[in-house]
Amino acid sequence: MKNGIDFVETEAYARIYNFILMVDDSIKNSEQRQSKHHMDVLADITRIVSETEKDPSPQRYANMAAKTVFKKIYDTYDDEYLRNSFGNQIRLDYGTGHELNFLCYLYAQYCRGSIGIDCVFTILVKYFEIVRLFITKFNLEPAGSHGMWGLDDYQFLPFLFGSSELCNTTLRFDELDGSKCYFVAVEKKLGGSSRILKSIMDKDWASINRGMIRMYDDHVLRRSVVTQHFIYGEYLRKDRSQANKDL
C-alpha cells in the first residue's frame, strides 16, 4: 500500500479475521438464531432483485437493468458496507471483495450490539441466496476468477461457514441435502468445475474447515487485489494492529 502499511498489518484485518473465527466457533457450538430486523432488510433486497425487470435488449455481458437494482439499494440504505455488498454498479460484477463488505457490515452490527454472534450465520445464508439470485438473473460478471483452480467464481464464505456447520457431524457429502449451506454452495456453484472441491470431497469436515479458513486468509484477506479498496470505518480501522506495533 502507498502509505507503507499493508492491509494484513491493520487493526481491521486483525478484527475481521478474529470475527471469522468467532462465527466459525459459534456455528460449531451454539444454536443459531435469526435477527428479524436483518432478515427483513434482506427480504426487502430480495424483493428489489425479484421485481426489477431485465432489459430485454441484446446484452453481451451483464444485463444493464442491474444498475436499477444497485440504485434502489443505494437509495434505500445508507450503510456503506451494505451498499457495497452486492457488486460494483459501474462494472456490473461481483466477487469476494463485495462478500467481504457484507461480513464487515455484520461485524459493525455486532459491535453496535444489533446482533449476537449466533445470528451471523443465518443472516449470511440468506445473503448468499440473494447474491446467487442477483448474479444469475442479471448475469453479473465475476470480479476476478480462478477458474477450475478456485472454489467458485464469485463466492467463498458459503464453503467456509458451510464446513463449520458440518464439523460436528459424520455426514458424507452424498448424504447432505439442501438444508446444509455447504451442499447448496456446491450444487449451485457459480462458474465452471472446481478441482479443489473435488480433491477435498473425501476429507473429514474438520480438515476441510481448517483448510477453508487458511485459504480464505490467503486468497481473500491477504490479496491486495481484493482489499485495495477496503472500506475502513469506526470499528474496522486502518491503524496498525497492536500485534504489529509490538514487533
From Swiss-Prot:
One Gene Ontology term of the molecular function aspect: peptidyl-prolyl cis-trans isomerase activity
Principal subcellular localisation of the protein: cytoplasm
Enzyme Commission (EC) number: 5.2.1.8
GO BP: any one term: mitotic spindle organization
Pfam families linked to this entry: PTPA (PF03095)
Keywords for the protein's UniProt record, in alphabetical order: Cytoplasm, Isomerase, Rotamase
A cellular component term, taken from the record's GO annotations: nucleus
Catalysed reactions, as listed in the record: [protein]-peptidylproline (omega=180) = [protein]-peptidylproline (omega=0)
Localization per record: Cytoplasm
Coiled-coil region list: none
SUPFAM superfamilies: PTPA-like
Keyword Cell membrane among UniProt keywords: no
Signal peptide: none
Keyword Cytoplasm: yes
Function, as annotated: PPIases accelerate the folding of proteins. It catalyzes the cis-trans isomerization of proline imidic peptide bonds in oligopeptides. Acts as a regulatory subunit for PP2A-like phosphatases modulating their activity or substrate specificity, probably by inducing a conformational change in the catalytic subunit, a direct target of the PPIase. Can reactivate inactive phosphatase PP2A-phosphatase methylesterase complexes (PP2Ai) in presence of ATP and Mg(2+) by dissociating the inactive form from the complex.
Record family assignment: Belongs to the PTPA-type PPIase family.
Name this polypeptide is given: Serine/threonine-protein phosphatase 2A activator
